[in-house]
Amino acid sequence: MVQTTKKLSILATFLFCALVFVACGDSGSSSVPDEFTDPIITPEEPPLDTITEPDTTTSDSVETYPTSFDSAGLHTYILENGVSSGNLYIFYPADSFLTKFEIGDIVTVAIVGYDTLEMPVVEKTSDVPIAHFLFSAVAGSNFVSLSIHNDSFSDVIGITAQNAPIEVNISLKEKGGFLFGLEMRYVQYLDVYPERYPELSVEEYANFREIRTTGMGEKKLYRSSSPIDDCLGRNLYVDSLAKEAGVATFINLTDTEDYARTYKDFDSSYYATQNVIYLSLPVEFYSRTFKDGIVKGFRFMIEHEGPYLVHCIYGMDRTGFTLAILEALMGAKTEEIQADYAKTFSNYFNVVDGQQVTLNEQQVDFFKAVVTRNLRAVYRADGIDIADADDIDWATPTEQFLEKQGMTKEEISALKDRLK
């Protein structure tokens, strides 16, 4: 039995001795890692996730349409060959753009006839959290671009090449407004060894916890890192904690069933004896695949008894977003949703010189803002606008969101009954 009140420095020798340091990869058919950028186990530079080069073989030229760069910003057009690989490309030299704007600025991008969005100016997709919009400007490039980290900007906005030319106006929203966000890339070092986390309990190290936000019943819903994937060195802890909590139904957001069964010790795990649905979802919150997948998972919860546990690999992005939806559905307040989401990052990051350094308040606040920003953005993409305020009702728009994904009012009510 895992004793959950003691520090890991005491427990490591008898619970963790068989676990080995293994670099994590994704599993199942999902090809995108579960990440903010890829959480880094060794202190190396984050990978350079460059924007795909656009197809410039067509004859359209930006000179065909009026382009100006004045005190108000850049006024230009997206052409037919600027809609490519899910991104929107503006054929305006990045070096010229960077004479007025700088990396780390936040800009307002008005895509005339479609939407007006705020996003940071960065170089690569991994400079921003999962599902965030970004304006990429890489010195030396003959273009700048609009993208979403791990999703298709053009699909989310509803733009195809046939819609071109499309007028775009870019203006400054906040000078240096995302500089702290860029610094946050360098707190993402984690470790598989429990002795690196002397201040964490077993539950915290395993990223295992019960969800007790407003409206959620006692011992109804849990979240964690993977109970079966040994790449983070936490699976045996999670499996033991899940057994202790009496978890009866697992929602596996990451694996296929066939892949899950290849994990070491899977057959002898508590996990293997319980109800499990294997969803193998990409980290693409706007995508039809992801939305259909979580609905499938929610229906599985309706059909099976709890307690329930939702997990991916880290229990971070896919799990964090899915749990935010369930918390919002049950009536959680903004601060509760944010605090639960940010807790995961406090449990993993920030290992420096072999020991975790507790995240400061500003760093925690950064992660808190990520989850509600993602909820608003994904809901908005489905036509559900939510005020940018803290004291809002999340339950009603969440029910609307689930209905748009095909759930009936009766199913939503049944899901809520399971979680009360």
Residues of each region from the PLM?
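Bacterial N-terminal signal peptides that target proteins for export
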Residues: V2-A12
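C-terminal motif of bacterial Sec signal peptides marking the signal peptidase cleavage site
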Residues: V20-A23
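Cys-dependent protein tyrosine phosphatase-like superfamily
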Residues: D26, S30-P33, I40-T56, N150, ...
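Long, compositionally biased stretches
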Residues: T58-N150, S154-V156, A161-N169
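Active-site cradle of extracellular carbohydrate-active enzymes
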Residues: L309, I313
